[in-house]
Amino acid sequence: MKYYIIAGEASGDLHGSNLMKAILAKDPTAEIRFWGGDLMQNVGGTLVKHYRELAFMGFAEVIMNLRTILGNISVCKKDILSFQPDTIIYIDYPGFNMRIAKWAKKLGIQNQYY
């Protein structure tokens, strides 16, 4: 099975790494592609973007980086289309993840919020 996991924060990286370990224990042939951090990368799979590139806090910082944020959404959608996962698992990071989930649902891709 092919899994696409999106964790945009350090806490999501921790939860994502534990989830990936559990997935791989049950399905050693699982293909995992993810947005996360070092902990998830240490488990395996393919890191697309590190959460350090995604973390913008506060209203002003979000506004100043709006072009980057929208660009990341576009990169994510293109990567999902290329990878063609069986399911996408979202870990926190609601501002980004809910946009991707709404789009993916229209395409018939299974969505899971962790």
Regions found by a protein language model. Give the residues of each.
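Active-site and donor-binding regions of nucleotide-sugar-utilizing enzymes
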Residues: Y4-Y114
